[in-house]
Amino acid sequence: AEILRVHHATVIRHIDALEQRLGVKLFQRHARGYTATEAGQDLMQVATATDDQFTQLAGRIRGQSDGVSGDLVVTSLVMLSPVLTPVLAQFRRENPDLTVRFLTGARLFRLEYGEAHVAIRAGEAPSQPDNVVQPFFSQTMHLVAAPSYIEQHGTPDGIDDLVNHWFIGHDNIDSRAPFIRWLAEKVPENRIVFRITDDRAMVDAVVSGAGIGFVSTWDMRQHPELIEVMPSQKEWTAPLWLVTHVDLHRTTKVQAFLKFLKEKASDWEV
């Protein structure tokens, strides 16, 4: 009743009417409130699925409007923000009827429910059957430390010496990033003494001398004082993918943005 903003008596009348029409009890009444019967639980599952389908339909309808206008929802890892934000800003300037929603983080937004128009994802190629997946680029990663760390602890003498150093890692042990998985395989857990949930925080922690950690080529250019502790490995490379839902992929707005993004990204060194 509170969520619907109606009196609880109104909700009770609707429940009674629904039970009468279906000819079955949906709830057990007791002093503490209502408990769903087996039939009530079945109805809830169907209602939830129906609500999800309407949400999905609404998202697709919003995304299928003609022209480059309305919302453009783009999701990405936060580590791409420094290079992606200027592209989004310029695209918005060239399309003044557009509102950009740039959603960053590790969450996988559900494109099939219209939660985003374009997703940039890292790791293995997404395999959802209703998504259109295109290779974007591969991000080269570097294992580095700040001068303050090197002064205190020195530089690792090869892979075997990594166990004698302190590292910055991800707080999510299930991270799909290849360089984070590599670190978990090569370095004992007790040597990863600074954990983060945000890739930008990884850079800040490295610069602060909290330990050895991974940064991108772009970050290396921004912080030339950082020192590579070993040559970059191919297995650290993070492949990135452009992902769109099949129902929105051919819309004018999505196609215009994808074309614009690919042109701008051809000059990136990340």
Task: For each feature predicted by the language model, list its residue ranges.
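Conserved amphipathic alpha-helical core elements
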Residues: 18-19, 226
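Hydrophobic hinge/microswitch elements
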Residues: 187-228, 250
